[in-house]
Structures are given as C-alpha cells and as structure tokens.
Swiss-Prot record:
Key word ATP-binding present: no
SMART domains: Fapy_DNA_glyco (SM00898), H2TH (SM01232)
Upper taxonomic lineage: Bacteria, Pseudomonadati, Pseudomonadota, Gammaproteobacteria, Candidatus Pseudothioglobaceae
Cofactor binding, note field: Binds 1 zinc ion per subunit.
PANTHER family noted in UniProt: FORMAMIDOPYRIMIDINE-DNA GLYCOSYLASE
Residues that coordinate or bind DNA: 91, 110, 150
GO molecular function, one term: damaged DNA binding
Protein name: Formamidopyrimidine-DNA glycosylase
Keyword entries, A-Z: DNA damage, DNA repair, DNA-binding, Glycosidase, Hydrolase, Lyase, Metal-binding, Multifunctional enzyme, Zinc, Zinc-finger
Pfam families: Fapy_DNA_glyco, H2TH
Catalytic activity: Hydrolysis of DNA containing ring-opened 7-methylguanine residues, releasing 2,6-diamino-4-hydroxy-5-(N-methyl)formamidopyrimidine; 2'-deoxyribonucleotide-(2'-deoxyribose 5'-phosphate)-2'-deoxyribonucleotide-DNA = a 3'-end 2'-deoxyribonucleotide-(2,3-dehydro-2,3-deoxyribose 5'-phosphate)-DNA + a 5'-end 5'-phospho-2'-deoxyribonucleoside-DNA + H(+)
Residues at the catalytic site: 2 (schiff-base intermediate with dna), 3 (proton donor), 58 (proton donor), 259 (proton donor)
EC numbers, comma separated: 3.2.2.23, 4.2.99.18
Length: 269
C-alpha cells in the first residue's frame, strides 16, 4: 500500500510535469473507485490551470482556481504522466489531459483509491488527521504525551492517523525495529526516553524511504515508472525466518489488528 514516502515521491515527481499545465479534458474511465468520482469534474476542471500540488498524510492535494482535487492512492494506486497518445492501460481509471499534449493517469488495480473535490480545500477526510511526522511539531515529547493511559499496543498507536499520519505498516515495523521496541508493548508503558528514540527513528526511516524512491512490494511505481528501492533495505518487514542483522536470531511474524507484524524477539523489548 502506498504510504507517506510513496505519496511524497509521487508529489515530487508530478511537480515539474503538471504545475501550470492547463486541463484540456477530464476523463472518467470508470465512475467510482472507493467512492464515486464526481462527474462534474469534467466541467469544473475544464480549462483550469494547476497552481500547486501538496501532500497531506497520504492524500495528494492538487490546487486549481476552482478548488482542490483530492487524490488517495488506496491499496495499489500509482500516477504517471505520459504522452496523450499513449494507449490506455487496463487499470487507468481517471485521467487529466493537458494542453501540452501530456496526460496524468491514475492506475488503481484494486480500486481502493479515491478522487474527490473540494471548493475550499477542506474535507472531512482531512479534518481529523494528526501531525506530519517530518515536521517540527512531531517532536521528542509528542508521542509520550499522546500515549499516556493508552492501552493499545505501540504499533497500532503509531499507525493511528489521528495521532501521527503516514506511518503505515511497513514503516511502523521498521521504525520499531530501529528503536528496539517490541510491537506488542502497550503504548502507555513506553518511557519518555524510548519515545524520544522512536520519534527520531520514524523520521529517519521515512526520510531514507523517500530518498530511495519509496517501497515497491507489488503495484507501486514512481511517476517515471521506476520502482521504489527501499525494499532492498528492509530489516524486518517481509523477512519472516530470515536472520536479524544484529543478533542473528530469526525474524518472526505475528498478526496485530489484522495486519502482519515482523520483529526480532531478542532485539526488541
């Protein structure tokens, strides 16, 4: 699933290709993804220029004079910008064509993504989001303060988008391994010192993943079509029964809240 690094990489790849481009045509190759795609986008975005593109959590916010296009990549989505004459691929469900002869296409095989629109840039899906992990507000004391009296496990806690956004399953596993914290430990039982270490580990893991172009496990690709290379540096995620880099014991897999969790029982306490 595209997580914060993959969405950030997508945003950075789109900036030089679509900023200031004028939409000549909007095509809905299917009427719905996770939710219905607004049909009035065909008229609302016609002849509109793209002013900015930003990321909030795992959402892409594409700003026009008329409002903001909100895109979520879902479980399997990716975006590419291609020549307008390029043959349409099977799972390319939404398309913005530009006057310069290029086309931005959303590919979403599993159709859990979303294409939404807001006139003022606000949306109920954005209203309850927590802080951005790569911004200064996500500081050494933030997680500790939020975790007091929390009984949920630490992994589910840092994956809660109302607490901090964008720390998906892959990066939660990797961050907890780097911080030597057992993913089953209760969030309220983690010390302030360990939260300080975990906060920096989350920042470091996400930054490394962005530099590597994200993680490609199955469907994700960058705007230029290349895969993300952070997959090659994963320490625990997807590494069941492989050897821990540090203690040489086996990485184990458990299930937490219907998600696979990978960790080292010896290194993570």
């Amino acid at each position: 699933m595209p997580e914060l690094p993959e969405v950030e990489i997508t945003k950075r790849g789109l900036v030089p290709l679509i900023i200031n481009q004028e939409v000549s045509r909007v095509i809905l190759h299917r009427e719905n993804l996770r939710w219905a795609i607004p049909k009035n986008l065909i008229t609302i975005l016609a002849n509109q220029k793209i002013k900015t593109i930003k990321r909030r959590a795992k959402y892409l916010l594409i700003k026009f004079e008329a409002g903001t296009l909100i895109i979520h990549l879902g479980m399997s989505g990716s975006i590419k910008v291609v020549d307008i004459k390029t043959p349409l691929l099977k799972h390319e469900h939404f398309e913005l064509q530009f006057n310069n002869g290029t086309s931005m296409r959303l590919n979403d095989p599993r159709r859990f993504g979303a294409v939404l629109f807001s006139k003022d840039g606000s949306h109920k899906l954005l209203d309850s989001l927590g802080v951005e992990p790569l911004e200064a507000v996500f500081n050494n004391g933030y997680l500790y303060q939020k975790s007091r009296n929390k009984r949920k496990n630490i992994k589910d806690f840092i994956m809660d988008s109302k607490i901090v956004v964008g720390v998906g399953n892959i990066y939660a596993c990797e961050s907890l391994f780097m911080a030597s914290i057992n993913p089953q430990r209760k969030a309220g039982n983690v010390s302030k010192t360990r939260y300080k270490i975990l906060t920096q580990c989350i920042k470091d893991i996400l930054t490394q993943a962005i530099k590597a172009g994200g993680t490609t496990l199955q469907d994700f690709s960058q705007v230029d079509g290349n895969p993300g290379y952070f997959t090659q540096t994963l320490s625990v995620y997807g590494c069941e029964n492989k050897t821990c880099h540090f203690c040489k014991s086996k990485i184990i897999k458990i299930v937490q809240n219907q998600r696979s969790t990978f960790y080292c029982r010896k290194c993570q306490t």
